């Protein structure tokens, strides 16, 4: 985004970041067009973001959750994932850092790939500032790169592995397949 905040970028592109955060159709379609996303990619983006279903429920990865299971002032993530993202390119470390959708869900407590607990990266009450990932990541990038957020590894439990698979693929061959996640 060439050094501008998400809010400034959104305005430059003709929509507000607040409208995008709340997945208003015009803002989403503008972002989809800017990113050159096809219909399947659009649906994947929305499913990993979480879409409001009324006042207190959200659809996330084909499941229905209470909003608070996904939307909180504290933003969590795996510092190892973010560090690997940063190391994957030359240039500003934050240019490649990607926030993962599953990190939003309060039931997800571990990055299964790295066996690392999710840690709170920042806590901001105002959603427009909270979800300006570019700005927030700039504030903590050096800490991520030097391992300040790193914690001891943890072996994933059967629950961690099951939840990761169900969210990632929608496949559940257990007796829980007909049960909702929340």
Give the location of each predicted region.
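Domain-exit/linker segments immediately C-terminal to small folded modules
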Residues: 104-182
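A structured, charge-rich N-terminal accessory region that forms the first stable segment of a protein
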Residues: 1-91, 97-98, 102, 168-178
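A short secondary-structure junction signal
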Residues: 89-93, 121-124
């Amino acid at each position: 985004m060439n050094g501008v905040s998400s809010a400034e970028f959104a305005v430059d592109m003709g929509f507000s970041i607040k409208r995008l955060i709340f997945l208003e159709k015009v803002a989403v379609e503008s972002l989809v067009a800017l990113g050159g996303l096809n219909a399947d990619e659009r649906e994947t983006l929305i499913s990993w973001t979480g879409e409001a279903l009324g006042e207190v429920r959200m659809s996330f990865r084909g499941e229905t959750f209470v909003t608070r299971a996904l939307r909180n002032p504290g933003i969590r993530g795996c510092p190892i994932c973010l560090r690997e993202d940063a190391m994957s390119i030359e240039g500003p470390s934050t240019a490649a850092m990607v926030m993962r959708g599953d990190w939003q869900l309060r039931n997800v407590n571990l990055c299964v790939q790295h066996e690392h607990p999710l840690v709170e990266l920042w806590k901001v009450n105002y959603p427009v500032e909270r979800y300006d990932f570019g700005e927030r990541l700039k504030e903590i990038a050096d800490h991520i790169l030097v391992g300040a957020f790193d914690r001891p590894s943890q072996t994933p439990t059967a629950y961690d592995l099951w939840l990761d698979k169900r969210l990632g693929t929608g496949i559940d061959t257990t007796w829980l397949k007909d049960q909702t996640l929340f």
